[in-house]
């Protein structure tokens, strides 16, 4: 720490390089450093730690201008002197913005893990349940992340297998297998249990039925996740927008829509770069 000039995230480093001055961060990245996003300040308990507080950045809302683009970059890219540099956000928040989700709607990311976020009027923080909130404008993204997800499918199936078994599934007839798919022991949300073991038995002889059972299990975890968020004070989603590799599976979306009794759609846009561009456009107007 004696040789450090700033405490920063990767996004903060890029921000500093672009505007020629370091020492700024956005509220979404700063949350990971312990920033109090409700009171919008660094908490008092940081004073009890052996941390030079002058290293901590000045925190601003995501999308807020922090300065002009530095002259070397303006010259290199042929941009005007009026070009502003805006505070960024985390990749997951940018992906949420990219979907165009509205207040009360949720985004489920079906990647290697299962990540849920719902846009709410009030924040929810329940670390014992793996639940946290990111500030986004005058609203909040309340969410949690399960260890379940596509990583489990990859342990058993190739892309060709998934395509073939999806066509063979009979989603009108649930398997009743009651799986809790995990890639390894341990879960964090909606059940916070480091000792929770995967439940993938019994395994039927029919691989398509086994595949369907795993999808049903992940869908059930998603359902319980939104129930957990609602029990803690978040709204029940009016719609679930899906991102990640599992978003394109229409049969899975239908299964999840029936279980949650709300529309489940695939996101038209989900790239973090697109969401960041939308954030910048809003912040610069």
PLM regions and their residue ranges:
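Nucleotide/phosphate-binding loop and acidic/charged catalytic motifs
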Residues: 24-29
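Short beta-strand to alpha-helix junction loop
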Residues: 38, 62-69
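A conserved helix-loop-beta module that forms one wall/lid of the active-site cleft
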Residues: 48-64
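Active-site core segments that coordinate phosphate-bearing ligands/cofactors
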Residues: 1-10, 15-21, 32-50, 71-241, ...
């Amino acid at each position: 720490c004696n040789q450090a000039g700033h405490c920063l995230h990767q996004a903060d480093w890029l921000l500093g390089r672009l505007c020629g001055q370091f020492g700024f961060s956005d509220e979404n990245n700063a949350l990971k450093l312990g920033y109090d996003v409700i009171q919008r300040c660094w908490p008092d308990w940081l004073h009890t730690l052996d941390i030079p507080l002058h290293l901590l950045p000045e925190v601003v809302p995501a999308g807020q201008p922090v300065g002009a683009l530095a002259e070397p970059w303006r010259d290199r890219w042929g941009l005007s002197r009026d070009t502003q540099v805006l505070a960024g956000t985390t990749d997951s928040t940018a992906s949420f913005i990219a979907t165009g989700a509205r207040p009360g709607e949720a985004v489920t990311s079906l990647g290697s893990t299962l990540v849920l976020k719902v846009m709410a009027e009030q924040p929810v923080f329940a670390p014992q349940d793996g639940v946290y909130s990111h500030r986004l404008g005058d609203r909040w993204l309340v969410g949690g992340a399960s260890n379940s997800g596509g990583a489990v499918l990859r342990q058993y199936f190739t892309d060709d297998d998934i395509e073939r078994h999806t066509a063979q599934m009979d989603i009108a007839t649930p398997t009743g297998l009651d799986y809790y798919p995990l890639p390894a022991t341990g879960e964090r949300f909606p059940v916070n249990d480091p000792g929770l073991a995967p439940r993938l038995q019994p395994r039927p002889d029919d691989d398509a039925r086994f595949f369907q059972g795993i999808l049903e299990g992940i869908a059930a975890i998603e359902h319980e996740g939104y129930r957990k968020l609602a029990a803690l004070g978040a709204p029940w989603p009016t719609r679930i927008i899906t991102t990640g590799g599992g978003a394109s599976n229409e049969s899975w979306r239908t299964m999840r829509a029936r279980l949650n009794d709300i529309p489940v759609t695939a996101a038209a846009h989900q790239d973090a770069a697109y969401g960041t561009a939308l954030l910048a456009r809003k912040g610069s107007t």
